[in-house]
A protein has these predicted regions:
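Alpha-helical transmembrane segments and their immediate juxtamembrane cytosolic regions
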Residues: 1-254
């Protein structure tokens, strides 16, 4: 495998005739940098919820400052690229708008909170439902000033995504505690062969483009409730294909 990777690096040439070189790392790079920063924060803070929530709030406020306002089209804090602060946040720590940091810190807080509530009488599912409602309300309020955008990594996107994740996590924990873990077996391939499942949509997308299928999709596939439904169906198809590949012993390993 290592020899194959070295061979591919040596023979790689981009459409402009350039050899392989470092470039923007994409979403996986953003995730990696975010995990690194948040891991360091957790290393020093550990399970101190007050400090964890403070760091989450800092990331969230930073996203509000860095993202473009809907009304003006400009961010509240526009940092020049030759500025020292820009160098630290965007070139050394690579936190960008802070949205990914807020999402990751939210996950850490949720995990720590679950551990702390295990020995108490407060039902975890009730707690997560209340928190999800508060986060959704925050998303509704901030949406008056910023758009909901994953690409721009805005605050409303962070809050709405967090609300959905927290609520579903609480429901899943509750169902598992009731012995219903088997209900989620149909999506197990996504966790057992994560990298394979991650690449399946890209493979399908290229196949669709090759045969012109992507050009004949109806408009309702792109937006609204039916658009969401089509995304869910496509996701399940990808999980199903991953399951088939596992059965054929086709699996990518890291």
């Amino acid at each position: 495998g290592v020899a194959l990777l070295i061979f591919m690096i040596v023979i790689y040439v981009d459409p402009k005739g350039n050899l392989i070189r470092a470039g923007w790392w994409g979403i996986l790079g953003l995730i990696g940098w975010t995990y690194l920063v948040c891991a360091f924060i957790y290393y020093f803070v550990r399970t101190d919820l007050k400090k964890l929530i403070l760091m989450w709030a800092i990331f969230l406020v930073w996203s509000m400052l860095r993202c473009k306002l809907t009304a003006s089209g400009e961010p509240l804090l526009n940092i020049p690229q030759n500025n020292a602060l820009y160098t630290v946040t965007d070139q050394i720590l690579n936190i960008g708008t802070g949205a990914h940091g807020a999402l990751t810190m939210g996950g850490i807080i949720l995990s720590v909170t679950e551990l702390k509530l295990r020995d108490k009488k407060i039902p975890f599912v009730a707690f997560t439902t209340i928190v999800a409602a508060i986060l959704a309300l925050g998303g509704l309020i901030t949406n008056n000033f910023w758009i909901i955008s994953k690409i721009q990594a805005t605050a409303p996107w962070v809050l709405y995504s967090s609300a959905v994740a927290v609520f579903l996590y609480g429901v899943i924990v509750w169902l598992v505690s009731k012995g219903k873990a088997s209900w989620f077996k149909f999506i197990a391939p996504a966790g057992e062969a994560t990298l394979t499942c991650y690449l399946v949509p890209t493979i399908l997308g290229n196949i669709f483009m090759l045969f012109g299928i992507s050009q004949i999709r109806p408009e309702w596939c792109h937006s609204g409730f039916l658009g969401i439904l089509s995304c869910i169906i496509f996701s399940l198809v990808c999980v199903g294909l991953t399951w088939c590949m596992n059965k054929l012993y086709l699996k990518l390993k890291v």
